Design a protein with these regions (language model features):
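N-terminal low-complexity, intrinsically disordered segments
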Residues: 1-73, 77-79, 206, 212-215, ...
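Conserved short hydrophobic interaction patches
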Residues: 41, 45, 92-103, 220-223, ...
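Aromatic- and glycine-enriched beta-alpha-beta binding-site module
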Residues: 69-121
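Amphipathic N-proximal alpha-helical interface segments
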Residues: 65-76, 182-202
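Beta-strand elements of well-folded, non-transmembrane domains
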Residues: 22-26, 82, 118-120, 164-166, ...
């Protein structure tokens, strides 16, 4: 058995968003009337309530807006923009799912997704000169890690899906990664800084009973933490200032 993988906590954390999303067969009661019973069960943690922009769902959020729940007629999602520990996010997801299951009673979730989005900003970490092959594992960089490749990189994006080697072949890993230009609201693209986007999405392709949800999410989290550590080389790891366990 492989050792348990834990996320390294960084002072300059690159993780910008974590989302757990559950799909289920359409529930027509959700768009037909406001989910008052569900709100009653999650209001202590998510007191702010608003419809989604398309008016087809609802958003329940903390007052600081750093964590929120999105409910539509066929999806339930918990999103966190200040991730620090898996146990804390896992507990939040469990509480929301329990509230949803109590009110709506789904027999199964048709798709279960755990997604981590990370944005690496070497200049913000004080790294100069910028040499990506000294920061990101060459296996992740692909051809951009080849020696002798010169020029100012303008952009790169790669998208692939792999079947994970267990769970009966029903689990998938989607990786979206590449180079981006990071700009602040007042900046133009020309004055932005180079960044590297790493989006890890783990999901099921077969229905999952609610009682199997927690162990599957735990497994997805382990896969995500392991892959993240494989991608980050020592120089980048140090520059992001790892915190003591």
């Amino acid at each position: 058995m492989e050792p348990r993988q834990e996320w390294t906590r960084y002072t300059k954390s690159p993780i910008v968003e974590v989302t757990c999303q559950l799909h289920f067969p359409d529930l027509l009661t959700i768009p037909a009337s406001p989910p008052a019973a569900f709100q009653d069960k999650v209001r202590a943690r998510y007191p702010h309530f608003a419809p989604t922009q398309d008016r087809r769902g609802y958003v329940f959020s903390r007052l600081d807006r750093q964590e929120f729940v999105t409910l539509t007629q066929n999806t339930l999602a918990v999103t966190l923009t200040t991730f620090s520990e898996w146990a804390e996010f896992r507990a939040a997801c469990a509480g929301v799912e329990t509230a949803f299951r109590t009110v709506y009673g789904p027999a199964a979730y048709t798709r279960t997704t755990l997604r981590y989005r990370s944005l690496f900003r070497p200049q913000a970490y004080g790294i100069t000169p910028l040499e990506w092959d000294q920061l990101i594992n060459a296996a992740a960089l692909g051809p951009l890690a080849l020696p002798g490749l010169e020029g100012a990189l303008q952009g790169s994006r790669h998208d692939l899906v792999l079947a994970l080697p267990s769970a009966g072949g029903t689990d998938r890993f989607r990786l979206v990664h590449g180079f981006v230009t990071v700009t602040e609201p007042a900046q133009s693209r020309a004055s932005g800084e180079p960044g590297y986007l790493l989006e890890q999405e783990y999901f099921t392709i077969d229905p999952l009973p609610p009682q199997q949800l927690a162990p599957r999410l735990d497994r997805f989290n382990q896969e995500a933490a392991r892959f993240f550590k494989h991608c980050v080389l020592e120089r980048l790891h140090t520059a992001m200032m790892p915190m003591a366990a």
